[in-house]
């Protein structure tokens, strides 16, 4: 950091409270933060030093980096290993047995690294991760230059990474202490789900998060079976159960939230619980379709997650949001729901608010971190442009992302990572696949 530069574009989408779009806009970055925003001609008048680099051009769109609010990055190494199965069978017969055999810091580091480069190249600058061996996740993210909210997975049973709930919580506490002041890594506590965590474990997770002012990340009501089990075991639906035991406090991102009734949605809105909508994973596993339009109407902050690439099978938020918008229009028979501006908010500022980092990222405003994405609009499938939001949400592809900045550092230039050998990461993935395939 310490570098000053200008980024210009034909369209600058601020995602501020006024949803301002500046045509022929530009911004100035200094010491990793946005120093100034305005029209390109005015910016050039104010910053006349010819040595200041200028990125972008007159045929691009500049926007805040996308935020993936639910994923398991390292699971990219299980991409395509088991498809076309219901969630429970997919987990118990394929994913969990493979994790038991291969889960290690090396596996997590290599998988996370591959996921990070996939996310960066598709415009994601921050991801909210729930997994194990958090040190390996953090090191991979920092090496790749991406921002990450890293949640230590918490379960009641042992895995290759821990002996049980108290062990996972101790690891979470240690990780929080180490990374609480890091510029790229935000620690979190991630109790896996109601069906894998006891009441005591859920409450201990919440207390640890509240004490350290870090986010909570949990799977919630992903399948109807999960709701039935909660009713059977606890006498209440999942959201009502969590409210009843006193869990719903702090900054919570609830992944999936597919099977919520109206009362549960009201509770989510009341308690300011963020929802990470993972439409592709939910569709592929036949888990159901979350009532996103209804949630948004009732004031729930909904953002987008990809889930892990093992169930998606990619980490492309542009694809995710386009499908989400169309599915909601279809199931509600209302073409006005999830309009293109709402969709952009779900990728950016609403996601930041869900994670409690809206003062730092999520919009292009002075003082915020320079997490930025430049999209090349000079493509046949992106022209003509009448509404830039529409072009991005309904027409753009991950491959249209050309340049990506994180924390004021140019990480992706012309679609290539600037300081990592992509081929090396691909070769490692192939090596892991051979081991897993032959096991």
Swiss-Prot record:
EC numbers for this chain: 3.5.4.28, 3.5.4.31
Catalysed transformations (reactions): S-adenosyl-L-homocysteine + H2O + H(+) = S-inosyl-L-homocysteine + NH4(+); S-methyl-5'-thioadenosine + H2O + H(+) = S-methyl-5'-thioinosine + NH4(+)
Keywords attached to this entry: Hydrolase, Metal-binding, Zinc
One MF annotation (Gene Ontology) recorded for this entry: 5'-methylthioadenosine deaminase activity
SUPFAM superfamilies linked: Composite domain of metallo-dependent hydrolases, Metallo-dependent hydrolases
Binding residues annotated for Zn(2+), in chain numbering: 70, 72, 219, 307
Enzyme class: hydrolase
Any matching Pfam family: Amidohydro_1
Cofactor: Zn(2+)
Binding site for substrate: 99, 192, 222, 307
Listed InterPro entries: Amidohydro-rel, Deaminase_MtaD/DadD, Metal-dep_hydrolase_composite, Metal_Hydrolase, MTA/SAH_deaminase
UniProt similarity note: Belongs to the metallo-dependent hydrolases superfamily. MTA/SAH deaminase family.
Protein's name according to its UniProt entry: 5-methylthioadenosine/S-adenosylhomocysteine deaminase
């Amino acid at each position: 950091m310490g570098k000053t530069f200008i980024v210009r574009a034909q369209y600058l989408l601020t995602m501020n409270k006024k949803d301002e779009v500046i045509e022929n806009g530009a911004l100035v970055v200094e010491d990793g933060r946005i120093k100034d925003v305005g029209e390109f001609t005015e910016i050039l008048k104010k910053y006349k030093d010819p040595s200041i680099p200028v990125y972008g051009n007159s045929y691009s769109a500049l926007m805040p980096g996308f935020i993936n609010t639910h994923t398991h990055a390292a699971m990219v190494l299980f991409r395509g290993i088991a498809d076309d199965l219901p969630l429970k069978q997919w987990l118990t017969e394929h994913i969990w047995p493979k994790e038991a055999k291969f889960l290690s810091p090396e596996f997590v580091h290599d998988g996370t690294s591959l996921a990070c480069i996939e996310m960066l190249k598709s415009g994601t600058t921050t991801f909210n991760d729930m997994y194990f061996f958090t040190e390996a996740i953090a090191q991979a993210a920092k090496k790749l230059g991406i921002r990450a909210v890293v949640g230590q997975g918490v379960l009641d049973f042992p895995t290759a990474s821990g002996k049980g709930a108290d062990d996972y919580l101790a690891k979470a506490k240690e990780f929080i202490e180490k990374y609480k002041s890091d510029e790229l890594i935000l620690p979190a506590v991630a109790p896996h789900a109601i069906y894998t965590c006891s009441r005591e474990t859920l409450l201990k997770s919440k207390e640890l998060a509240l004490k350290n002012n870090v986010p909570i990340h949990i799977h919630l009501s992903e399948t109807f079976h999960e709701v039935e089990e909660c009713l059977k075991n606890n006498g209440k639906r999942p959201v009502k159960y969590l409210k009843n035991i006193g869990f719903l406090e702090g900054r919570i991102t609830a992944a999936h939230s597919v099977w919520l009734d109206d009362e549960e949605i009201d509770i989510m809105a009341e308690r300011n619980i963020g929802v990470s909508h993972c439409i592709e994973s939910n569709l592929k596993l036949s888990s159901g379709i979350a009532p996103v339009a209804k949630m948004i109407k009732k004031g729930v902050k909904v953002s987008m997650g990809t889930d892990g690439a093992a169930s998606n099978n990619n980490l492309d938020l542009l694809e995710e949001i386009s499908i989400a918008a169309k599915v909601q229009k279809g199931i509600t028979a209302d073409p006005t729901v999830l309009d293109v501006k709402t969709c952009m908010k779900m990728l950016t500022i609403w996601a930041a608010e869900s994670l409690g980092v809206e003062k730092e990222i999520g919009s292009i405003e002075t003082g915020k971190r320079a997490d930025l994405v430049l999209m090349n609009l000079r493509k046949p499938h992106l022209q003509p442009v009448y509404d830039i939001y529409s072009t991005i949400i309904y027409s753009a592809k991950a491959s249209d992302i050309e340049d990506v900045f994180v924390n004021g550092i140019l990480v992706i230039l012309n679609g290539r990572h600037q300081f990592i050998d992509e081929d090396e990461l691909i070769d490692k993935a192939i090596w892991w696949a051979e081991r897993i395939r032959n096991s």
